[in-house]
Amino acid sequence: MKIKIALEWFLNPDHLPMIAGLVTGKYKEAGIEVEIIQPKEHYDGFEDLKAGNIDIHCNEPLHLYEHHFEGIRSLGCFFETRGGVMIRADRVEKLRSNEKIKITTPASNPVTNKIGFEIIKRYADKNGFVIDKENVEFVEKDFWHLKNMKEDESFDGAWLCFYNFEGIEAKLEGFENLFIDQFESPYPNFSALEFMSTQSTIEKKGDAICKFIEVTNEMNKYLKNNPIEAQSIYYDYTKEQKNILMDSIILDTLIRLESEIKVDALRWRELYCFLEELELVKLNEQEYAKIWNTSHH
């Protein structure tokens, strides 16, 4: 049976579990034909999921709430990293002085900007200084955070950074920074990827989806134990030129793969409360409970 899965952005090492399932032929052995679709925009997958054009979408868990629609279901989280706002080391003083700061982000909209500011604000509260909302400007660029900061000195930082990407890249390049994640600022982490589907898809393809999760679970375990093999699987599939940065990103990504992909109603509960507090989402108890009521899986 065919399973169409849409990613949240371009193919990268976060998606290694699925890449491995394809390269090793394990999905095929389990009787499922998996097709990976890369989106044009970060949120494309939700429209496709709702319309039934795809069977599974992977995206950050906050979108289960923020892009909630009747029938959306979680299939479990397969990867979690540290994430947040990266500030150039030499601009931290500027931040502390409540001066105007400019931040590059792949998505500048009221929701992501509000979350980005809240993370900085909580960091400020924790460290005893004040930051005004009007002093933080989010400018929409693309996902190449470090490149954008290097090419444009006016950027003081970047928002929507994953440590296994930007953190590793900055470390390799000697780009000094303050990485404001959930350890620096008290907020619930959501830099993770969750498999999502819909009730109607689960009713139609429940067995195939179960198989998909089963094989992907196996791949996670295999990759974590075989880092060199994981690198060659990645290069084999993407046809990218082997390089030190990608090697390092892959190694850091592997330690962040989940040992077991499972539906967990409590895992992102605190995240839901955080988003509700920011008046970004509002679900009743029944709507919340239904997200995790993936009966067939």
Region roles according to the model:
Residues I37-Q38, Y43-G45, Y65-E66, E166, ...:
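Short secondary-structure capping/turn micro-motifs that flank functional sites
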Residues G128-E137, L178-I180, T238-L251, V281-Y288:
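Short, surface-exposed acidic
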Residues Y272-H297:
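Conserved C-terminal helix/tail region of periplasmic/extracytoplasmic solute-binding proteins
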